[in-house]
UniProtKB/Swiss-Prot annotation:
Keyword Cell cycle set for record: no
Reported function: ATP-binding RNA helicase involved in transcription elongation and required for the export of mRNA out of the nucleus. SUB2 also plays a role in pre-mRNA splicing and spliceosome assembly. May be involved in rDNA and telomeric silencing, and maintenance of genome integrity.
Protein name (database record): ATP-dependent RNA helicase SUB2
Main localization, broad class: nucleus
Length: 433
């Protein structure tokens, strides 16, 4: 459904975008009460539809049932009916509303696996996210035994990828990859993309804002057929990047589930604690001692600080695990898997865990160091309170710069972040019963 990418995507003319009314907006139009509920981020009117109403394959419905999902989220209800028809989709929706399931389910619904043919291509900007998306495909295709999915990313031997792609027996129908590795495979003529029917970019703003990644994506895009479905998703999608995304598409369905002023997280309590830099370790120890949580992720600004804080926590009898870009690739994946499997309850991380990574048990996010950008705050704290569940986010504010970032966050997302109360927080307000 898309035309070939242009050589220079920066040369575009702005076109008017029409935000598609979401189900919540329609439901909220019925009464003042509904409008007020919608303002607070509630799920007004979205449970009227079940996954069965989408007329999905029985194998998909069975897998969805095994996952315990009964009703689609807001973004799923709006997107899936169009995406399974092959419509190009540009979707921005806040963290935790199941955007990944939209393209996983719609591509599996349309997939008719042919040995040796790649039908679906999914591009994302980090290896961890690629690994996670692959797992989502495995989860929803469990009753589709003929479907093969592979993940390709840098930091691993490319020869292994080439060997998998050579044989009809091992060549996947679905490829999830980072731009650099996929571009290398295209250059090596090791991957055949002439049968691609679905072209997906997850966290598309992050991929296309980087000039290097964008060039890689353009080259990859040109290696795919003229006629195909293109879908792009992100939690944040600025007005500037939207036209760039649309250059890859033909008449896309544009879905902005929440406008930019309301990109807050339903069910997530957000607080800050003002203190000196030297007081952070003591305060963090107090929080971990006093707060109830399933799993916690602690964000720091550098790999060095991640290692140092992880070492300190372990020495203070807080068994933790550190995940950051300074680790060898296999080790990063192994630590990510270990944390996801609940072998450790505390994870110290840089922003490598700040986007798209989904670990359902996390219900506490602590910004030991605040991010430099307001948008990154959303992706970080979005690790807690996924899928509309409760969660708690606490930011340690230790400098004038931190105070400025906090102001930007509150202004950007139209949210009031209050000071953490001295008496603490009632666990029932952020722990799911």
């Amino acid at each position: 459904m898309s035309h070939e990418g242009q050589e220079e995507l920066l040369d575009y003319s702005d076109s008017e975008e029409i935000a598609v009314p979401t189900t919540t907006e329609v439901a909220g139009a019925d009464s003042a009460t509904d409008k007020e509920a919608d303002k607070k981020g509630s799920y007004v009117g979205i449970h009227a539809t079940g996954f069965r109403d989408f007329l999905l394959k029985p194998e998909l419905l069975r897998a969805i049932g095994d996952c315990g999902f009964e009703h689609p989220s807001e973004v799923q209800q709006v997107c899936i009916p169009q995406s399974i028809l092959g419509t190009d989709v540009l979707c921005q929706a806040k963290s935790g509303l199941g955007k990944t399931a939209v393209f996983v389910l719609s591509t599996l619904q349309q997939l008719d696996p042919v040995p040796g043919e790649i039908s679906t291509l999914v591009i994302c900007h980090t290896r961890e996210l690629a690994y996670q998306i692959r797992n989502e495909y495995a989860r929803f295709s469990k009753y589709m035994p003929d479907v093969k999915t592979e993940v390709f990313y840098g930091g691993t031997p490319i020869k292994r990828d080439i060997e998998k792609l050579k044989s009809k027996d091992t060549c996947p129908h679905i490829v999830v990859a980072t731009p650099g590795r996929l571009h290398a495979l295209v250059n090596e003529k090791a991957i055949r993309l002439s049968n691609v029917k679905s072209f997906v970019i997850d966290e598309c703003d992050k991929v296309l804002e980087s000039i290097d990644m964008r060039r890689d994506v353009q080259d990859i895009f040109r290696a795919t057929p003229h006629q195909k479905q293109v879908m792009m998703f992100s939690a944040t999608l600025s007005q500037e990047i939207r036209p760039v995304c649309k250059k890859f598409m033909q008449n896309p369905l544009e879905i902005y589930v929440d406008d930019e002023a309301k990109l807050t997280l339903h069910g997530l309590q957000q607080y800050y604690i003002k203190l000196e830099e030297k007081e952070k370790n003591r305060k963090l120890s107090d929080l971990l001692d006093s707060l109830e949580f399933n799993q916690v992720i602690i964000f720091v600004k550098s790999t060095q600080r991640a290692n140092e804080l992880n070492k300190l926590l372990c020495s203070c009898n807080f068994p933790s695990i550190a995940v950051h870009s300074g680790l060898p690739q296999e080790e990063r994946i192994e630590r990510y898997r270990s944390f996801k499997e609940f072998n450790k309850r505390i994870c110290v991380s840089t922003d490598v865990f700040g986007r798209g990574i989904d670990i359902e048990r996390i219900n506490l996010a602590i910004n030991y160091d605040l991010p430099n950008e307001a948008d990154q705050y959303l992706h970080r704290v979005g690790r807690a309170g996924r899928f509309g569940t409760k969660g708690l986010a606490i930011s340690l504010v230790g400098s004038k710069e931190d105070e400025e970032v906090l102001e930007k966050i509150q202004s950007r997302f139209d949210v009031k972040i209050t000071e953490f109360p001295e008496e603490g927080v009632d666990p029932s307000t952020y722990m799911n019963t």
